[in-house]
Amino acid sequence: MFADLDYDIEEDKLGIPTVPGKVTLQKDAQNLIGISIGGGAQYCPCLYIVQVFDNTPAALDGTVAAGDEITGVNGKSIKGKTKVEVAKMIQEVKGEVTIHYNKLQADPKQGMSLDIVLKKVKHRLVENMSSGTADALGLSRAILCNDGLVKRLEELERTAELYKGMTEHTKNLLRAFYELSQTHRAFGDVFSVIGVREPQPAASEAFVKFADAHRSIEKFGIRLLKTIKPMLTDLNTYLNKAIPDTRLTIKKYLDVKFEYLSYCLKVKEMDDEEYSCIGPRRALYRVSTGNYEYRLILRCRQEARARFSQMRKDVLEKMELLDQKHVQDIVFQLQRFVSTMSKYYNDCYAVLQDADVFPIEVDLAHTTLAYGPNQGSFTDGEEEDEEEEDGAAREVSKDACGATGPTDKGGSWCDS
């Protein structure tokens, strides 16, 4: 097709400049340099690198990248050749091979089109859908298989809930212990006052000793609060700083992941479009003019994949460190909590054992309860009122008899 035109078709570079160069690569044990080639006769006037594979001579050298045009192999021009012929030329060379290329000076922002943005949005929506739901809605699930970071994110959320519950429980427990210590202090103050006012020395000493025991328990409670309170600070640091920072990193990773998947999907669509036009033997305009749009997307995909791989590595390292900190920190915090509580109860038990002062003998005042012949019987107020009423009635009857005079034996009144 291009032989008839002698390759004088003007390339549509989309304003993307190219810089010529050459690189010498040492082949690996499989006699490969680690690149895949696209384009070439008979539909495209140039050959270009589609992908640079990881951990290969081309990838380790880093000179050539996806989208770069290949112009020659070991000083021989490849103009008008197919990609299969160029691949054979590279394979025939043993040891070192020199690749002549035109470096594509592409700006990744040029590849971030509206189509890529919409694909990222679709991937975000489909990410949390099940396969059945996505198929019912006619959406393809272009996701990475065995992406363990999604499960790690769920584990992180469960860990955050665990720490949140521990923090709330510890706050309530410390508040209860503070109120309990204040109650012990009030007990100590009350028994101290009783001991000071008690006239009997033995009883006074017993009350004071019991009061000191409660005051000591109050001090033990304050010491417990001071020991466990830093536990809240550590838990809050993990909950409010470490976990949100890791969650933000995972969100950035997901954004890079969706961008990479969007470019992969775009490349797949452009490949399908190109293959569909091969059958009728008519080339696409972008293919016949150098396929620069496709090469730009290839470069963007490669750079997005590099960012994705680096971000994934960083997230895995951060998650690993966070898991180690979680295991070590939770063990340390629980050990500190248990040891502090154990010391508190042991100290309280020892203090109360020393303050075993009951029963206490107390002499009550003589005015309260008195026994003896000189003391009258105890009467309450109701009996005194009844006696007063009976005395008043007898006095009234005597007065009546004195006013009317005496009576005779028959019971009749007689005048004096």
UniProtKB/Swiss-Prot annotation:
Record Gene3D superfamilies: 2.30.42.10, Arfaptin homology (AH) domain/BAR domain
Outcome, altering residue 27 to A: Does not abolish the interaction with PKCA
Annotated keywords: Actin-binding, Calcium, Cytoplasm, Cytoskeleton, Lipoprotein, Membrane, Metal-binding, Palmitate, Phosphoprotein, Synapse, Synaptosome, Zinc
Post-translational changes noted in the entry: Phosphorylation at Thr-82 appears to inhibit the interaction with AMPA receptors. Phosphorylated on tyrosine residues by EPHB2 and on serine or threonine residues by PKC. Palmitoylation on Cys-414 is essential for long-term synaptic depression (LTD).
Positions bearing Phosphothreonine: 82
Entry membrane topology: Peripheral membrane protein; Lipid-anchor
SUPFAM superfamilies: BAR/IMD domain-like, PDZ domain-like
Residue ranges of domain AH in the record: 144-357
Name of one Pfam family that matches: Arfaptin
Stretches with biased composition (Acidic residues): 380-390
Tissue specificity remark: Expressed in all tissues examined, with highest levels in brain and testes and lowest levels in lung.
GO biological process terms held by the UniProt record: cellular response to decreased oxygen levels; cellular response to glucose starvation; dendritic spine maintenance; dendritic spine organization; glial cell development; intracellular signal transduction; long-term synaptic depression; monoamine transport
One GO cellular component, as annotated: Golgi apparatus
CDD domains xrefs: BAR_PICK1, PDZ_PICK1-like
Binding-site residues for Zn(2+), renumbered to this chain: 44, 46
SMART domains from the UniProt entry: Arfaptin, PDZ
Keyword rRNA-binding: no
Impact reported for residue 414 to S: Fails to rescue cerebellar LTD in PICK1 knockouts
Principal place of residence: cytoplasm
Location in or out of the cell: Cytoplasm, Perinuclear region; Membrane; Postsynaptic density; Synapse, Synaptosome
Domain remark in the UniProt entry: The AH domain mediates binding to F-actin.
Record function comment: Probable adapter protein that bind to and organize the subcellular localization of a variety of membrane proteins containing some PDZ recognition sequence. Involved in the clustering of various receptors, possibly by acting at the receptor internalization level. Plays a role in synaptic plasticity by regulating the trafficking and internalization of AMPA receptors. May be regulated upon PRKCA activation. May regulate ASIC1/ASIC3 channel.
Subunit structure: Monomer and homodimer. Interacts with CXADR. Interacts presynaptically with the glutamate receptors GRIA2, GRIA3, GRIK3, isoform 3 of GRIA4, isoform A of GRM4, GRM7 and GRM8; with NAPA and NAPB; and with BTG2. The interaction with NAPA and NAPB disrupts the interaction with GRIA2, conducting to the internalization of GRIA2.
Protein name: PRKCA-binding protein
Source organism of this protein record: Mus musculus (Mouse)
